[in-house]
Amino acid sequence: MAWALLLLTLLTQGTGSWAQSALTQPASVSGSPGQSITISCTGTSSDVGGYNYVSWYQQHPGKAPKLMIYEVSNRPSGVSNRFSGSKSGNTASLTISGLQAEDEADYYCSSYTSSSTLHS
């Protein structure tokens, strides 16, 4: 079972925004049913490292993205506790424990940024 990991692109104007930052995720992460995996999301002190506003989304093919984690480690109501978020320095992580077949999806991270630079 493998996941293609894509960067969520959120573009807005101005300084202090949910702008697209150069967040780096691994190209793919794989695991077997029952195992745990961790997906990293590395930014800078202007985004991931500077604010506790990292979110994670899950997207199945043909479906809208689903918010899984917000503000680094909070789960919305209805999201399984098999999903957990954390942050250390400029890197945020999403851990999925007890992998299940339905966890196969694209996972996206996003972060608030204080940078006024928009990356294309």
Swiss-Prot record:
SMART domains xrefs:
IG, IGv
This protein's GO cellular component annotations are: extracellular exosome; extracellular region; immunoglobulin complex; plasma membrane
List every stretch annotated Framework-2. Answer: 54-70
Which is an annotated GO molecular function term of this record?
antigen binding
| Region entry Complementarity-determining-2, spans | 71-73
Instruction: Please give the Pfam families that the UniProt record associates with this protein.
Output: V-set
Q: Where is this region: Framework-3?
A: 74-109
The UniProt annotation puts the region (Complementarity-determining-1) at: 45-53
Which residues does the annotated region (Complementarity-determining-3) include?
Answer: 110-119
Give the signal peptide range: 1-19
Entry keyword set: Adaptive immunity, Cell membrane, Disulfide bond, Immunity, Immunoglobulin, Immunoglobulin domain, Membrane, Pyrrolidone carboxylic acid, Secreted, Signal
Task: Provide the protein's localization.
Answer: Secreted; Cell membrane
Function, in words: V region of the variable domain of immunoglobulin light chains that participates in the antigen recognition. Immunoglobulins, also known as antibodies, are membrane-bound or secreted glycoproteins produced by B lymphocytes. In the recognition phase of humoral immunity, the membrane-bound immunoglobulins serve as receptors which, upon binding of a specific antigen, trigger the clonal expansion and differentiation of B lymphocytes into immunoglobulins-secreting plasma cells.
| Quaternary structure, from the entry | Immunoglobulins are composed of two identical heavy chains and two identical light chains; disulfide-linked.
What is this protein called in UniProt?
Immunoglobulin lambda variable 2-14
Organism encoding this protein: Homo sapiens (Human)
